[in-house]
């Protein structure tokens, strides 16, 4: 979070001690940044509950337990992706390079959330239909459509991150030039979305091949290409969070922006 010094300086800005023409600054309240991480935490919880139910199903098989664990494990990674997207959008704004996003943040956020939600709903409905033999094929199709929607979203986000990374190298803002931590943070987000997309592609292959396919009949495939990937993702974020998180990076951005505004104010007073 912002340091005490930065908070005092933000307070000065908020109380209009700077002249109006020099009072533009980009920052997010700490509570807003905390909520940006909420889908990620929820995804971890759903993954945990999903695997607990998987153990319960192995010891005491029932169709309801199977459906519940399947739906939770299908939906949880999309929550990781949602947090990654929101963090990426905020990062682009904090480095004053939102113009280099493939779609402006205010439009892309709504589009991503809606598309991702549609994908999740289709997977949840499809997972429910798997319980009935007559509707099992319909459920499988709905899950596949939902997964393809998410693959499109995640691929778009990947290209957005790569394009912004290129622009950060080619035409960096003053904030980016001040520290390479922004590049490192973008790499963390990029690694996260690649893991989610890789896992989603494996799931599409599984359902395209059918529930009786090799992947469906051999649990090790899902453990290697789903469980391991989704274990690595939160592990990477948790391991790097102390050193690289948006709270600390925002503090750097705010300080640079305020220094620039105060310099302008000093020049205008002279």
Swiss-Prot record:
Disulfide bridge positions per record: none
Gene Ontology cellular-component annotations: fungal-type vacuole; membrane
Signal peptide: none
Keyword Calcium on entry: no
Residues in the Extracellular compartment per record: 59-65, 115-140, 203-220
Compartments, record wording: Membrane
Keyword check for Membrane: yes
Transmembrane segments: 38-58, 66-86, 94-114, 141-161, 182-202, 221-241
Cytoplasmic side: 1-37, 87-93, 162-181, 242-270
Membrane-topology annotation of the record: Multi-pass membrane protein
InterPro entries: RTA1
The entry's keywords: Membrane, Transmembrane, Transmembrane helix
Family, per entry: Belongs to the lipid-translocating exporter (LTE) (TC 9.A.26.1) family.
PANTHER family recorded: PROTEIN RTA1-RELATED
Protein's name according to its UniProt entry: Uncharacterized membrane protein YLR046C
Species for this entry: Saccharomyces cerevisiae (strain ATCC 204508 / S288c)
